[in-house]
Curated annotation (Swiss-Prot):
A zinc finger (UBZ1-type) spans 762-788, 789-815. The lineage of its organism: Eukaryota, Metazoa, Chordata, Craniata, Vertebrata. Zn(2+) 2 binds at residues 792, 795, 811, 815. Residues 342-377, 486-519, 650-746 are annotated as: Disordered. GO terms for biological process: apoptotic process. Residues 149-487, 548-638 form a coiled coil. Residues 723-739 have a biased composition (Acidic residues). This is Tax1-binding protein 1 homolog B. Residues 498-518 have a biased composition (Low complexity). InterPro entries: CALCOCO1-like (IPR012852), CALCOCO1/2_Zn_UBZ1 (IPR041641), SKICH (IPR041611), UBA_autophagy_assoc_protein (IPR051002).
Amino acid sequence: MALFLEGTAASSAMETSNFAHVIFQNVGKSYLPHGALECHYTLTQFIKPHPKDWVGIFKVGWSTARDYYTFLWSPLPDNYTEGTAINRSVVFQGYYVPNDDGEFYQFCYVTHKGEIRGASTPFQFRANSPTEEELLTMEDEGGSDILVVTTKASYLEQKMEQIQQEKKELLENLDLLQKERDELIDEKNRLEKEYEQERESSAQLRKDVQELQLSAQSLQEEREEVKRRMEESTARLLQLEEDLIGVTQKGLQKETELDCLKDRVKKLNLEKEALEGQLKNEKDEKELYKIHLKNRELENTKLSAELQMLKSVDVNKENTIAQLKDELARVKSCLAEKEKQHRQLLANSSPSGESKALREQLRQKEEQLQATQQQANMLKAELRDSSNARDRSMAELYRIRVEAETLKKGQADARAECSRLEQQLEEMKSSTQQEAQCKESDVLAVAELQREVEDLRLRLQMAAEHYKDKYKECQKLQKQVVKFNEQQGVKRSPGSDAAAGPLSASPEASAPGSPSTSDAVLDAIIHGRLKSSSKELDKNDKYRKCKQMLNEERERCSMITDELTKMEVKLREQMKTNESLRMQLAAEEDRYKSQVAEKGRELKELKDSLFVLTKEKEKLEGQLQKSVNREEEQKDSNLDVQSVFLQYPMPYAQDDPSPLLVPQRPTDLLFGNPYSSTDSRDGADGEFSDDQMPRLPPVGPPSWDSNVVCIQPARNLSRPDGLEEPEEPQSTQNDDEPAAPEPAEFLNDGQMPFCFEPTGEQKRCPLCEVIFPPHYDQSKFEEHVESHWKICPMCSEQFPLDCDQQLFEKHVLTHFDSNVLNF
């Protein structure tokens, strides 16, 4: 009750007036936990029923309409009139109601809107406790002295179950007895019918005895005929057995031949697998040889190009050394002349600005001489290195040629091996065709034997059926003879009782023993024939299996032939691919040669353009020197006409401002002599005379910071990382000397001037710490730095000298993966 008060207090927030719209009738205080629960309620006139209204069981203390335990839809009343009260009921099944948990529950009516419009008094679900009148004491059935207290209802239920079990057993026994009675009645009727049949048969037998007596003699004659036929059939059976033995021997012979064929096919398969493996190995070796040959050809091409480049560099350096030697001799002679002039000037005149200029020129000449000597030493060292590199390149080229020859020999051997394998494939093909023909003939022989076996089997079955028919006829005749003899014995017996004894006796006792022996003989013959027929069936099964195996071997041989054909086609395709690759290789070689020729033409064009520019430069220098000479002549004319005693004669004529200090022999210089106004390089230059091409006098030698001393062709190679493009030296000129035109505008093809400036910074190799003079030829400096690296001939990527040679070769080969390795 306290729980009910708490539930009502918890639901005080809702409208209490709504709970009276539905009134629950006859609500008990408790109900059985698993029993059907019927709920009666009355819908007052204050509520309008709806099909979605429902009645639920709520635990006391609920707060919302969702706290239900279970619910049922409220049935909609028929012929409902608004404003009237109506009684309805719902039944909760036992498996939906709560268990005996000691809680209080109540019915609630919930509308389709979720409003609770009625609630019942609380109740519980609990089992009924029995009273003293319903209890009963009884002894234990186990024979002990224990008294068991139970309810009368359970006791009566137990007794009822026992009685029903006994009733069921009695009914089953009754059914069994009724079935036995019906069976006995049926047996009685059957025996009566058999008795009537026996009576009729005995009468019929009496009638038949007379007929049997008449036919006994004819049966005896037929028996003799049957014996004769049996002997003939036995002889025929022996003949069939001999034929079957012969057929069996032929089958065994064919089995041995089939085993031999299987062994031969296995050997051929093994040979085929070995040849396939050998062919695969040859293909792999061939691919490796191709790759190696391609690599060697690439190396050969690269080394040939390097060798040509080194040869050209060697020639250039030799020419440069010869030029420098000539220039050195020329400079020495110029210095001697200058020294003579200087002594004469010192002897004839006082020190003035001209002597200072001459001293400055002398100092510059000395510096120029030192730089020239240093450059000559460096060129000698480079020439020595280039000759060593050329020797190494020649040795490497010879080695590569030897390896190429060995590779060609290996390729020829591989081709010979491929031809040998093709010949073996042809031989295997012909052998498989011969085996297929042999197998076809074997199949025909097996089919012929199978037909013979089928014929023999049919004849054997016909003979067995004939013997079975004759055996049945003999049995019938023997039974008739036995019955006839029994009837004769009955007639001879003195009484009917004595005659009944022989009739009831078995026919074997009256027979003389010949029927039983004949039955045994026939049984033995039939068993033997059945065994022989079973053996024949087994042999036929064996022949069928052999035929199936032969067909399988034929299929395998055809598959092997197809595989050999496919391998031959693949080999031909591989040979075609090799030919196409060879053609591609030849095309690539032609393309490389054309590229090299084109590069040579471009180099020749560049040399020609350089030669033209050098000529133009020399012309400009000659014009400049002429203007300088004119100015000096004007200055000399303005001086005192006082005669000066010269210690040495004047080497220059007064009317010719451009004579040579030293008789000069024209030399074939590749890049021109920077100290001479003309440089005859070939026979075509001989048409220009000294009058047409004036030479510069030695009074105005080019300073180290003014013009180009020596120009070398620059290689079009990428610079190493960390090296910056050096700034071109700014030529400075003295105020008292005339300004000479810059030749850089004529050298815009990647060449850098090599000149030594005393005030400039020296160049230092970042790898070997070798010091180079300032404004050393940038291309040579880059060449020296790049000599510390391995350069890829395809992409110009740089690698350290100590890097793995295999990695370097692998990188070079990656440029040829698309057309060499993927075939």
